[in-house]
Amino acid sequence: MNQLTVSYGLISPDYCTSQDAHILPITKILYPDIPGKNYFLTSGRDGSIILHKNTQLSNEPETAATTIKNDAIRMQVHSDWASDLIHVNMKNSDPSAGDTFISVSHDFSIVLISVNAQLTTWDKKIIGDHDDYIKCIVPIHYEMSNDYELEEQEGGPDNVHDGINNGIVVDEQNNFLFVTGGLDRKIKLWCLSSGPEKMATLLHTFDNAQSNDTGSIYSMSPIIPKYSFDDNQTSRPFDFVAGDCNGDLIFYSCKYRKEVIRIQNAHRTNIKVVRTLDDSTRLISTSSDGVINVWDLNCRHDQTTGALQLPKKIGSWSWDSSIWCVQGTSLDKLYFGDSQGNVMRANLSSYEDAKLTRIFKPDHHHHHHHHHEHEEQNISTTDAKVKKYGGILDIALLPNEKLLFSFCTDSNLNVLDLTNNHFSVNEGGFALTRSSLLTNRRHVITENTKGQMQRWDIVSCELLNTFDSSEGSFDDIVMKYTSKEILSHWCTVSVKVGMLFVKINPKFLKTEVYGSALKDYQVVNNIEINSDERYNLGKIVINSLFNEFISYEVQKDKLLRKKIFSLKKKDLTNSLTLDTGYNSESKKNNKDKKRKSTFKISSTLSIGNTNSSGTPPNSAPATPVMAETIVLEEQPLLQSASDKAIDDSLELVQPLPASKKPYFRTQSSGSLLSRKFKSFRSTSGRATTGLNTPEEPKGILPDTPHVINDDSAFPQAINTTQQSKDATPESMLWNHPFKLEQKLSAISSQDLPSNNTHNKLRSSENSRANSTSTLEGNEKKKPEFMPDLLEQIQESYKQQYMNTSSLKYLTKRLPVTKIIKASSCPIIRVKSATLVLVHLWKEGSCGGRVLFSTLLPPSHVDNETVSGGKENSKPPDDEEVDLQAVDDDKLGKYDLIDGELGSRLNRRQIFEQLEENLPYWFAKALFRDIKTVEEQPKLNFLIMPWSSVGGSEAAGNENKKKFISASDTTESSGNDSSDSSLGNGNEAVSPSTQQQFHNMLKFGRPKTSEQELNPTDLPRISEANVKLVAPGMIRVKKIKLYVADRFETKTPEMKAKMEPSLWLDLLCRGQVLDNDMTLNTVRTLYWKSQGDIVLEYRRKVHNSPLVHEVNGNEGK
């Protein structure tokens, strides 16, 4: 089943200070020959694309001023290796609109990048994808004398070849064609339209899959086609060539949408490079075995058969290593980069006397020019003298005869001046290489390419520590900072593009943390942290990361409700379109235009009585409130930990009941919600078994153990993500670059329920039937993205408005909000920006496909945010509103642009993108504040008295039997011996507390040493109270409370009303347990078995306040 996940990447503190440096090797160097502009771009394995202004293009010597100046733009575009990059060269494009590029990546995405004319800000959007790593992208040329027909057009417009455009496809509509190839064995042909939206259309898919599951595409090159024969009786009826992993060269025609020629086994191994030369008359290809071939692309027809002959091989050479990159446009002047780090200049115009000259040798240049930097890069290697030089990933020649190239072993950009053979290096940064999530599920230990170990906090998104190498290896640091706090997994962490990423899936709300673990965080919403209360860690993280986004949506929701309320009652009789007041642009009539969400700036609201038949169409629900909406609204009525502080009283320690009944709030007989719930119970299996009905206990009642509950938890119904349609037909339009399909259908007046339909719902029979149809409708189309949730909310508001009585209308109260912020959830201050990603994980796919990504700045804290849950504790809907003072400009404060990130998007634009692309389950967790929590896994354990011999190491069935069949007296023989762990984990008691206990026990205190309190001198516990079941998150001190309460007689400490955590010890396998340790931690650290945990109890001796008082008085 397909799954949508949300991930966020932690931005390194030096991100903004190293705009001109990659942190992983550079994969592509592109010099776009744009008149009047001097800059080049680099893309890297760190997923970023850097625009370097003319710092490297000037022939003037570098000065200190030019060296210090940071004149580059770093664009974090991808979440995996950026593998290739092209410039979009459109005819008659507006220079003031800036420049456009397209990049492809190992994250399966094709991204359009727009840079403004001043080269100061940038923007991006996903316009396409593949099902595996994308390795290459090339623009498509065309023949000037032939029409180039697009599939979506009835007739292709005449295209005129323009030498300035270098033959790139343009037509009257100024479209741009390009192809992409990848490891999914597919080549996709795309058309990018002109205009501000720049929509990408998938025109055709070439399938190169072979019978032996091979055919991955590694390299491509465009060809200027020649479909008719010239005077030499030659032609080129193809417009690009691809090289695959089998060594085949495949020539395709985008005009005719077919494979024209295939040269099988053109190389023995996979092809690394294909490049057309000399105006597409020659082709050079290289393979991983070091073979270099040159082909003549002027094909001839066979005189006898008339078939098109294959391109002729006119030269072949062998090099001692694989050629990874080729730079040049003519055979007489080429530059090669090989897998050993050498750069060669080649002249292959004379095939009998080919010349290949090595102009760069890594040993010589590294020793002479950058010896210190190289040693620093390899500081973590075992032998600093052993230097490994990787291959050359890419080469680019600038107009000033400077050759740029990159190694696969570092992130440096190397510059070789061909005029004076001067070599220099622009040093790159350092990237993370591995990570380990600690058991507290909040801290992560990482290692970077510099050999440094660091500790990160994934809740506050900050770098906590950078450790010196003297503190040990990576594993040593992990062991040192692994605490005894062991929590269940709520996320997974990984290192991608040199950054630390945290992936959240729909089960992230299953982990809770005690308030004592949050004391070091800065809470910004005035929530008082209770150290003994449990908080949902996943909810804390998402509410802290998206705090400002939530406030933005709350404000938009309030403006929408004001607009709805501003309608007059008489307008209900007519079909009405309500503008929410956010629209700043006129709506387009293009049917394929990207749809906005229901709360988006250009959204509209339609309400009215249009369905006179009283029977709504099958595509629309027949109930005034959707089933999902009713369920979600009722959930906060359940008792849970998020509604109240978790009660640690003994009343929650009780036996497991034999049966449980569904829990529902009592409704009046005339309540619509009551009848709806009755209909759900009778028609929906989900309502009777999943939402409010706890799981039935298993086993026989006499053997049922006691249950120690930490809270009143109810199972939570999780809305599983539906499979998304794999929309890969021809002419697929990527109007919305972040979606797989159109997620929202147009809301027409015919789809809305009428008043007559609502009146019929007053009968329980029709309500029951309509509930069934509603559930069936939901099964047909389950929500996937946040606009689906916003549509449900808007429909609910319309129903509230339509059902509002005249009396309520006169009270001037807004409809009740459906966006509920987490009022009891602490909001943590996030210290840095994050890279937010939305992935689609298809069943059977090799990885996740990126649907959306954006840089999210940390939330600003203002008065509204600091008030936190106060707004939700008393919603503003109960206040009267002035309809004449509806302020539609409340969102202006979100127009702030974070210049340090380099993006041209302000916060409002970022939030609108999030609104379009966040998964439904994630948005529901943000805005619905569901009060039910996941039922904690329960563990079985036994409590038995501690024995000074053997401990619980030999505890098992025999010890259990001995304990159960023990004599009525539990008085010990008075053994005064104690093991070395007696004092471990005991808490110190202040003198004032000791004096308090002294006053309590000054009467009836034992006077002789024979009656001194011993570790085993404790009352017995009845057999019925020995076997227990408790949630894994229960603390040891609460188990102590239960143990003391189940003693058959009271101890002196109990008579003194001392807390059991002060005088009672619990042990597991001889280890004294800390009071704050959870039962999960005990099982993981000490018990290390799947069987019932055996805990032993005894009295503390040395640190007991009561013992101190007794001994002190005896000495007087």
From Swiss-Prot:
GO molecular function: ubiquitin binding
Residues recorded with modification Phosphoserine: 668
Entry's localization field: Cytoplasm
Positions bearing Phosphothreonine: 693
Top-level taxon: Eukaryota
Repeat positions for WD: 21-62, 91-132, 160-200, 219-262, 266-305, 387-426, 428-466
PROSITE patterns: WD_REPEATS_1, WD_REPEATS_2, WD_REPEATS_REGION
Biased composition (Polar residues): 747-776
GO cellular component assignments: cytoplasm
GO annotation, biological process: double-strand break repair via homologous recombination
Record's keyword terms, sorted: Cytoplasm, Phosphoprotein, Repeat, WD repeat
Keyword Isomerase: no
Chain residue ranges for the region called Disordered: 578-600, 747-784, 963-994
Biased composition (Low complexity): 967-987
Primary location: cytoplasm
Subunit field text: Interacts (via its WD repeats) with ubiquitin.
Domain note: The N-terminal WD repeats are involved in ubiquitin-binding.
Any further remark recorded for this protein: Present with 589 molecules/cell in log phase SD medium.
Function text: Ubiquitin-binding protein involved in the resistance to phenanthroline, sanguinarine, nordihydroguaiaretic acid (NDGA), isopropyl (N-3-chloro-phenyl)-carbamate (IPCPC) and guanosine 5'-O-(2-thiodiphosphate).
Name the record gives this protein: DUB-associated factor 1
Native species: Saccharomyces cerevisiae (strain ATCC 204508 / S288c)
Lineage, opening ranks: Eukaryota, Fungi, Dikarya, Ascomycota, Saccharomycotina
